[in-house]
Each structure stands twice: as structure tokens, then as C-alpha cells.
Amino acid sequence: MRNLLGKGYTNVDLIIMSASSPALVSATNQKLSVMEKIGYSLGDLAANLIFQTLVTFLAFFYTDVFGIPASEATFIIGTVGLVGAFVFTPLMGILADRTSTRWGKFRPWILWTAIPFGVLSILAFTTPDLTQDQKIVYAYVTYTLLLLIYAANNLPYSALSGVLTSSIEERNSVSAYRFVAVMVAQLIIQVLLLPLALMLGNGDKAAGFHNTMMLFAGMGTLFFLIAFATTKERVLPIVESTNSVIDDLSDCAKNLPWVIMLIVTVLAFITLALRGGITIYYFQNYLSAADLAAFLENIGFNSFIAGLNAVFMGMGF
């Protein structure tokens, strides 16, 4: 492997090769049980209960519930989001690749971040009695820490699907289960979050969002622990490298396909955030609450059905 470093291959290339080449991995094309596939998919359900809430309701929560000016809320979400994409994401990927425990490389991160993820999710939707400037600082700190933990959880979680088995068919099947879990989370957020916030807050928006997030955070933490307990890393990449973190970051910057995918991903998430964040303002300011709930329910239900249909078609049903 070290000889390849002198022949134009970067450390990133070697990692990809080691994770995909039958000659460089130690694993069998093992068929995964339905229990393991469901257990793994619960991790994405857990993450998206929080992520979909952030995308759809965080801006609204900051401005209309916590009382942060719209300009400040936009700046917080935008700047911290970019830091998460361009700093937290690559650093956590490199750190996860250097992890070696009796549980594997990637599974431990799901375990280590399960409780912090839940706690920070609750704190991000908590409204302490602070001055205007203190609220802005509080939002910066909690949102930054939440995105850091999200990266520490979601990067290893996503990589885990590639080391559960070396069977391409089984990996595709796992992805299908995972996609269904994402759509279920999206449906829950779009259909149930606002009614839950009203019910659990007894008309108090701040208490409603806080209590709803406590419910989602508790569910998410439990699902992360189940994902950790029901999965096993079987593909063992063999990569001999003594590169530093700086070297790895340099390799990433020189890897044009990686840079393109990073930019496309960031733009896609910006689009999701804009669409999700603006929708609730439009329907709150121009339509009644009942129309808003019905509209969101229809979107969620239709997307859920379309997503399930696409998955079943892809699986040959």
C-alpha cells in the first residue's frame, strides 16, 4: 500500500481502494438479517428526527419563539452550517478512519454520541431567560455543538453501511431500509411536530417545542443505541498509512471528485434549508393554522408514499 503513495495515489484513494477491493479486505459476502437492517436503519430515523426539525423549524424557533432577530438567526444558521460542512465533516471523517476499538471503527461513534446528541438537541430548543445578546451567544454555542455531534455521529454511521458486509446486493438492501427510515422521520416531523408542540405546550410555543424535542431526543437516543447493538463491522480495510491529519486534508483538497461532491452536498442542504425554513413563515403569515397543518400533512404523506414506491421498485417489487 505504501508503494502506491509514490505512484500518484493519495491517502484518500487508498482508503477507498481498501474499502472496495476484494483483495484488500477481510470479509465475506455475508447476508444480513432483517433485524440488523432494521436496527441499522433506526440510526437514520433517529438522526433525521433532529435534522428534519432543524431544517424545517429552527429558523422559525429562533425568530418567533426564542426572540432572536431574523438577520441574526439567518447568520447563525448560515455560518455554523458552513463550518459544519467544510470543517466538522472532513475532520470527523479523518478521525473516524483513525479509530480502532473492539467494536470497530465506526460503531463506537454511534454509541459515544447517542446521549450527547439527545442532550444538545434539547438544549438547542430550550429558551432560557437571557438578554438579547446572550440569546444570540446561546444559539451560536448550542447549534455549533449540535452540528459537531451530528457530524461525529452521522459520518461514521454512514460509513458503517459499507463495512457491514462486502455484498453489493446486501449493501443496496441496507440502503433501501435506511431510505424508508428517512421518509418515516420526514413524515413524523411534517405531520406531528406542530400538533405535538401545541398539545405538549398547552398553547405555549416555547414549552411545546422544548417538550416535543425532549420526546424526539429520547426516541433518537434509544434508536442510536439499538443501531449500535444490532450491527457488526465485518469488512476490515487494510490501509497502512502514517499520514498526518494535515496530509489527509491536503489529499481531500486535491481530490476533485470529492470536492465536487462536497460542494453539491452543501448546495443541496442549503436548498433544503431554504425551502423548509421559508414554508412555515409563508403559511403562518398568509394562511390559517389549519391550512398550514393540512398542507404540511399532504406534503409529508405524498412524499412518504412516493419514497416507499421508489424503494419497492428498486427492490424489484
Task: Name each model-derived stretch.
Residues 4, 8, 14-317:
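Membrane-embedded alpha-helical bundles of multi-pass transporters/translocases
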